[in-house]
């Protein structure tokens, strides 16, 4: 039986209860078989184009970098059906689940975008859908919660996203007819590889589009990092392009020194979490610390193993942006470009703007993966601005 590589350097693996191993092995083989099946590939690409709306646009910003010599492009995953890049992976996972003969899916979600994607993909391919969401995020992501309720069977709440992912894994192990949609490029093998392969369309399109527009590759591609699915989707096709910098942006929250952040890559320690070996936010006793970010989708205490490996070998750089910086970028792109970006994407955007302003005379070509739209965040942003007297 063919096997995928379970590790990225020292990171990754399959640290799960024995009861889950057969399901993961079955999934791995089903994914390999699907990838080798031209009919599966054709159906997946057809759904991406005719249902999801790919290819997404590559938009040159007109005003954000005025006064500098930076050309900043946005890869518009916010224009994808469902409102974010999550649609790419759930369509693929849904087709695999259907191929495996599953009748239902279970998924966890933070900001709700993976939940929305899971619900729409399940409705499309005819699978029952149960979504588990942290109680805190149910409150701050009410628009996405209602969208999920329109399409999904049930949305029970947990206390935190950390608990939600563990509940989803536990429920998955209880029945052979259920397929688990994992929401990011993390977790036990083979999920990091599966999610990357269904998301790599982002980077593949970006490469073709930027070559057509500029006649060369960008100097850097940037993406926000929670678990890392949108970033690895952007990075995957550029990893072998040595002259293209890969820059991931973690949430610094209220400041790295406050411990209220979600930056395990640069400020965590290697541990075992969510079925994988990866950098992890831990206290002095080795217990998992709660992550924090104004952005629900980046509020995750660990990170995908391929990002950990890219960081370890120096192929990618990982920086951090605070809540305040992300909020400023959120407002800036709205006022200057007429785009309401997700708070997640605003972290990457904030770092790109910072790069342009640090050296305004430097000629550089940057691409930010605008991973989702900000409709879901408008109530959060309104509350924050109101508290600061900025409205």
UniProtKB/Swiss-Prot annotation:
It comes from the Bacteria. Its cofactor is pyridoxal 5'-phosphate. Its EC number is 4.2.1.20. It is an enzyme of class 4 (lyase). GO terms for molecular function: tryptophan synthase activity. Keywords: Amino-acid biosynthesis, Aromatic amino acid biosynthesis, Lyase, Pyridoxal phosphate, Tryptophan biosynthesis. Tetramer of two alpha and two beta chains. This is Tryptophan synthase beta chain. The lineage of its organism: Bacteria, Pseudomonadati, Pseudomonadota, Gammaproteobacteria, Vibrionales. The gene is trpB.
